[in-house]
Structure formats: structure tokens, C-alpha cells
């Protein structure tokens, strides 16, 4: 799930801040929300000397939005001593400059269905902390080694519109189902 990937990217950054792709995904993700590539990402990533990391460019930026992002990222680096569950919990409960917690940012960007997989990730982190030595790098390695897929029960009724493929909706029931004809050409007068 994309919310889980966003949380794992925060852990990856804390372990290796020089990983430019991970950092770019965090910038565009729900925690920072800098989705305008032309304004944020291209000037930071494209206009840099060879060998200069994206993290270095972010720290040197004078753009107020990038400075706020740098502050959030520095906060992640200050938490590297925490166990994985404590790290994730502190990020999700932290109130940002915009007045929203990490949970609220995930919900606003990805919707309420994103909460279950993120909670499952945090449960995995708590289990990992009790069995293995609590380290961010160890938890990341365990998650990547097991490649576990966290799914949500979609059969539970909710008051929301779900856009799904026919295969994904197989076996589900709803009072209204819309099946658009995506293969026919435009009809005259419509």
C-alpha cells in the first residue's frame, strides 16, 4: 500500500539521508506534500553539481516550503536512535507546521482506507522490536526480506465511493455499480 511505502521511506531516509530517490518520494508524499515538481523537485534535483546530494540541496535552500521540509527531515534524523515502532509512532503523532498530525496527512492524501495498512505496519514494527534488536535498518531489512502484503477487508460497508477494476471488485456487492464503456468511441450528440 502506498501509505506503507511512504512510512518505509521515512525509515529509509533516517538510515541513509543521501538516497536521492527516497528523499524525492518523501518530498512528494503526504508528509511534506511538495507535489509541484516544476517549483520544488526540478530546481533542487536538476540544478545541482555532480556528487551533490538532494539532502544537501534541501539544507541549503532558502525557499520557505523547502526550509519547512528540511526541518521535518532533520527531526527524522534526530530520531534514528529510537526503535522502529517509537520512530513511526512519533512521526504519526507529531503535529506539523500545518497543524496536522501524520495520521491526518495520510488520511487527507490517501483516504481512510490507508489507516489500516499503516497500523498493520506499526504492529509489525512493535513485533519486530520485541523479537529482534530494535534498529531501523534491521526492521527495514526484515520488511524487505518478507515482502508481506497488507490487505484491507473491502467487504465492510462504508459511506464512500470506491473506484475499482472489475477484478478487484469481484465478489463485492453495492447498491449502485457504474460500469463505463471505455472501449467504444464517442457517440454523436453526447
Sequence positions of predicted segments:
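Conserved helicase C-terminal RecA-like lobe
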Residues: 1, 5-190
